[in-house]
From Swiss-Prot:
Keyword annotations of the record: Chaperone, Cytoplasm, RNA-binding
Pfam families the record matches: ProQ, ProQ_C
Region (Disordered): 106-188
SUPFAM superfamilies per UniProt: FinO-like
GO molecular function, one term: RNA strand annealing activity
Family: Belongs to the ProQ family.
Database matches in InterPro entries: ProQ, ProQ/FinO, ProQ/FinO_sf, ProQ_C
Upper lineage: Bacteria, Pseudomonadati, Pseudomonadota, Gammaproteobacteria, Enterobacterales
GO biological process, one term: post-transcriptional regulation of gene expression
UniProt name for this protein: RNA chaperone ProQ
Disulfide bonds: none
Length: 237
């Protein structure tokens, strides 16, 4: 009788165990917690099959129980199973806590490896004379608008509200034509200290008081208390 081909890797051994004991091992998805002492059960039942050795079984079992999907399955209330899928007791709290720490450490190692790889890429880019572009942070508070599904049933859409009737605003009272218009100052020598005057700023004018008449303009004080020198073309009565 010819010898069966030997399994070379721990992953191949795990695939064999999942096929041989489907109620205990699984090749994908969340794994079930294993019975304490299941290694000895494996030795008794599969040693010699596929030319498996104890070392191969121990390595495959270590890889299986340290995988993320196995650690995810070790949670409060979960039951351990034997090779035939029979329950063998609920997990103890200390075992659940130990699995949680192992999972956190594994995730931290992966994040550290990714950060190290990114740092090496940046260093290589800088050495090559390239400037790596920093990641642009996503603006906080802005969320993408929900897309409207094509072909949505018309009854699911909210009816449009009829436009509100526009309110008729009363006409603004026209400015009396007899209202006196401001007169620009043409001769600053006619101004007197203490005289009330207006300073034109754009389209509006501000009240001011004449403080001093100088050669380059008139020093005035605004109603806000601010004093400044203003040229004649910006003054008006």
């Amino acid at each position: 009788m010819e010898n069966q081909p030997k399994l070379n890797s721990s992953k191949e051994v795990i695939a064999f165990l999942a096929e041989r004991f489907p109620l205990c091992f699984t090749a994908e998805g969340e794994a079930r917690p294993l019975k304490i002492g299941i290694f000895q059960d494996l030795v008794e039942r599969v040693q010699g099959e596929e030319n498996l050795s104890k070392t191969q079984l121990r390595s495959a079992l270590r890889l299986y129980t340290s995988s993320w999907r196995y650690l995810y399955g070790v949670k409060v209330g979960a039951e351990r199973v034997d090779l035939d899928g029979n329950p063998c007791g609920v997990l103890e709290e200390q075992h659940v806590e130990h699995a949680r720490k192992q999972l956190e450490e594994a995730k931290a190692r992966v994040q550290a490896q990714r950060a190290e790889q990114q740092a090496k890429k940046r260093e290589a880019a800088i050495a090559a004379g390239e400037t790596p572009e920093p990641r642009r942070p996503r603006p906080a508070g802005k969320k993408p608008a929900p897309r409207r599904e094509a072909g949505a049933a018309p009854e699911n859409r909210k009816p449009r509200q009829s436009p509100r009737p526009q309110q008729v605003r009363p006409p603004r009272p026209q400015v009396e034509e007899n209202q006196p218009r401001p007169v620009p100052v043409t001769d600053i020598s006619k101004l007197q200290i203490g005289q009330e005057i207006k300073v034109r700023a754009g389209k509006s004018a501000m009240d001011a008081t004449v403080l001093e008449i100088a050669k380059d303009g008139v020093r005035v004080q605004l109603s806000s208390g601010l004093a400044m020198i203003v040229r004649a073309e910006h003054l008006q009565f």
